[in-house]
Design a protein with these regions (language model features):
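Membrane-proximal extracellular "stem/stalk" segments
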Residues: 1-14
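Short, low-complexity patches enriched in S/T/P/G
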Residues: 11-23
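Intrinsically disordered, low-complexity protein-interaction/activation regions
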Residues: 21-263, 269-304
Length: 304
């Protein structure tokens, strides 16, 4: 009576065994196909530029994770090579101005600077021969520095000198800044914090006073103030403590910004810090009087 069951068990064992390995093989195959598809999409996404400047910057990713292949223009000018070594000292005063002049214009407009304009800015009043010699020598020196840092080159195209960076390998804070402000009406708190982090190193090239730079500095200051105030007045701004930070940051660019003062005082009041709100107002009207030599035309109760 026990014979037939034993025969059944004996014949079913290899079936189960082969079925098991069949499913295992299919699982491995599906895993490999899925992994390959994910890798393909990841690489494709990395190399296709997005039309949305907001999506181009990840909100949960800090702008400056490390100093490797990094150029800072906000605050002190600094440039770091791929190993994170500060190579700013390699730039003589003239080379530094040449580099910054080309960098700012290249990042801003993508074309760089017209050759004649470059000569006019750096060697105005010199003979044509002197200008040619100076340009040739300093361009060669700049190329020598750039050749040592990779993924960056000095080019001349259609009469324009420009610097070209591969932003997959380089972080340039001014480039990230321009990406952020292109869609200032769409910025949320996360992206405002990115801008805050970017600009908190200081004003744009704060220790450099080139005449040609004044226009860029004024434009950036106005843009930063504009972006922060647009956000502060939007429906997205509902964090009073963050609004106070924004107001304080605007004051770094404009000491007597009436809008920043109102934002700060109202935010402090909403937190129940009425005495601090009044103190902030008093500091503002004192600075206003010193700068404009006249009294501010509103009282505290009017702005709250």
């Amino acid at each position: 009576m026990e014979g037939p069951p034993l025969e059944v068990l004996k014949s079913s064992s290899p079936v189960k065994h082969s079925t098991f390995w069949l499913f295992m093989g299919l699982a491995v195959l599906v895993g490999l196909l899925t992994g390959g598809l994910v890798l393909y999409l990841h690489r494709r996404k990395r190399h296709i530029p997005t039309d949305d400047p907001i999506k181009a910057l990840e909100p949960d990713k800090k702008l400056s994770v490390s100093n490797s292949n990094t150029i800072f223009l906000f605050g002190d000018f600094q440039i770091f090579d791929r190993d994170g070594a500060d190579i700013t000292k390699l730039f003589t005063p003239l080379l530094k101005e040449l580099f910054l002049l080309l960098l700012v214009n290249s990042v801003k407009n993508g074309r760089g600077l017209y050759a004649e304009k470059l000569d006019e800015i750096l060697w105005f009043g010199r003979s044509e021969q002197s200008v040619r010699n100076n340009r040739s020598v300093n361009m060669a020196k700049l190329k020598s520095i750039l050749e040592s840092i990779e993924h960056c080159q000095l080019l001349k195209e259609a009469g324009y000198w420009k610097l070209e960076f591969d932003y997959d390998f380089w972080y340039v804070d001014y480039h990230s800044y321009l990406d952020l402000i292109q869609a200032k009406e769409k910025l949320d708190e996360q992206h405002i914090r990115l801008l805050f982090e970017l600009a908190q190193r200081g004003n744009f090239l704060s220790n450099h006073n080139y005449e040609w730079l004044d226009q860029f500095k004024a434009e950036i200051s106005n843009e930063v103030i504009d972006v922060f105030l647009i956000y502060a007045h939007s429906a997205k701004a509902h964090n009073p403590e963050f609004l106070i930070q924004i107001a304080n940051f605007v004051f770094n660019f404009d000491q007597v910004s009436e809008e920043a003062m109102i934002i700060k005082c109202r935010a402090l009041s909403s937190l129940g810090k009425h005495s601090l709100a009044k103190k902030a107002f008093d500091v503002f009207i004192k600075d206003y009087r010193l700068i404009y030599n006249e009294d501010f035309n509103k009282n505290f109760n009017e702005i709250i």
